[in-house]
């Protein structure tokens, strides 16, 4: 999957999970500061990403995923 395709899929998931317009979801968007996610939203978002991309995101890694770009990079790295 290309980075653009990954970004679009992440953008769609984030938009749905956080009830924000997909246009607001940019690479630099911080889940909590920019998109209004709380800690429960973040956990649910990680679970949705794991399911959508068929990957496992350990808690330690999830703590380092603060932005949409972080999520895309992590997924790209996992899918090699």
Swiss-Prot record:
Could you give a GO molecular-function term held by this entry?
acyl binding
* Keyword field contains Transmembrane: no
Cited function: Carrier of the growing fatty acid chain in fatty acid biosynthesis.
- What post-translational events are described? 4'-phosphopantetheine is transferred from CoA to a specific serine of apo-ACP by AcpS. This modification is essential for activity because fatty acids are bound in thioester linkage to the sulfhydryl of the prosthetic group.
Q: Looking at the record's lineage, which domain of life comes first?
A: Bacteria
Pathway field: Lipid metabolism; fatty acid biosynthesis
Record domain Carrier: where: 4-79
**Which parts of the chain span the membrane according to its record?**
none
Coarsely, its chief localization is: cytoplasm
Point out the coiled-coil segments of this chain: none
Q: Where in the cell is it found?
A: Cytoplasm
GO cellular component terms, semicolon-separated: cytosol; membrane
Q: Which GO terms describe its biological process?
A: lipid A biosynthetic process
Protein name in UniProt:
Acyl carrier protein
Q: Name one Pfam family in it.
A: PP-binding
The UniProt gene name for this protein comes to: acpP
Report the family membership: Belongs to the acyl carrier protein (ACP) family.
**High-level lineage:** Bacteria, Bacillati, Cyanobacteriota, Cyanophyceae, Synechococcales
What HAMAP family does the database record attribute to this sequence? Acyl_carrier (MF_01217)
Which keywords does this Swiss-Prot/TrEMBL entry list? Cytoplasm, Fatty acid biosynthesis, Fatty acid metabolism, Lipid biosynthesis, Lipid metabolism, Phosphopantetheine, Phosphoprotein
- Residues annotated as carrying O-(pantetheine 4'-phosphoryl)serine in the record are 39
